[in-house]
């Protein structure tokens, strides 16, 4: 939470759980959002970080996904918000996972894009889940991007439905330390995880 505060985010209503690396946080998130051996799916944006797929499969959690297209220049096209919402309506996932500094696509998701995803999550009453392992990175011409930059004035109803996966392995280059975290602004989810 001190890192969030140092980066300028309001941490007053965020609950945290320190985990044995980001991988443990990923598993706890999946279990908390969908339940073990659940019929409740999770929504990924394809391609996604492969460990999420492995963990969901191991925990018998169904996966639904929205494929992203590659433009003629070899870059991933902007997210198709209509396809994301249609998939949510059709498959009823419990949560939508995204990575603002996307691994493996390399696509940067701006605050505007995250707001659009948040509005979809609020409209469809699902969790908005962000893998924040790269949050401290910033790129020329882009401000840092995080689920924790959103507030009620950006997206009415977002409070209480955000979850983030934290890891010291990427930005801090500390893979061997196995320090991760699961953050949420929902006390009930925090207690369940």
Please report, for each region that a protein language model flagged, where it lies by residue.
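Conserved core of the PLP fold type I
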Residues: 1-119, 135-159, 163
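Conserved core segment of the aminotransferase class I/II
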Residues: 59, 151-193
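Helix-to-beta-strand junctions that scaffold the AdoMet/dcAdoMet cofactor pocket
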Residues: 122
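Residue-level marker for buried hydrophobic side chains located in beta-strands
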Residues: 128-129
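Walker B catalytic acidic pair
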Residues: 132
């Amino acid at each position: 939470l001190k890192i969030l505060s140092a980066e300028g985010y309001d941490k007053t209503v965020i609950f945290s759980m320190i985990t044995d690396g980001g991988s443990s946080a990923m598993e706890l998130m999946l279990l908390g959002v969908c339940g073990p051996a659940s019929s409740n799916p999770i929504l990924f944006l394809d391609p996604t970080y492969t460990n999420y797929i492995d963990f969901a499969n191991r925990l018998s959690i169904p996966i639904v996904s929205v494929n992203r297209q590659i433009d003629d220049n070899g870059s991933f096209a902007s997210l198709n918000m209509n396809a994301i919402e249609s998939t949510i309506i059709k498959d009823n996932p419990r949560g939508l996972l995204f990575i603002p500094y996307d691994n493996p696509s390399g696509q940067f998701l701006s605050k505007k894009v995250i707001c659009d995803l948040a509005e979809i999550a609020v409209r469809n009453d699902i969790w908005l889940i962000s893998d924040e392992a790269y949050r401290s990175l910033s790129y020329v011409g882009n401000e840092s991007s995080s689920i924790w930059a959103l507030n009620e004035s950006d997206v009415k109803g977002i409070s209480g439905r955000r979850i983030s996966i934290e890891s010291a392995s990427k930005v801090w280059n500390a893979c061997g330390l196995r320090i991760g975290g699961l953050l949420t602004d929902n006390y009930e989810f925090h207690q369940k995880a």
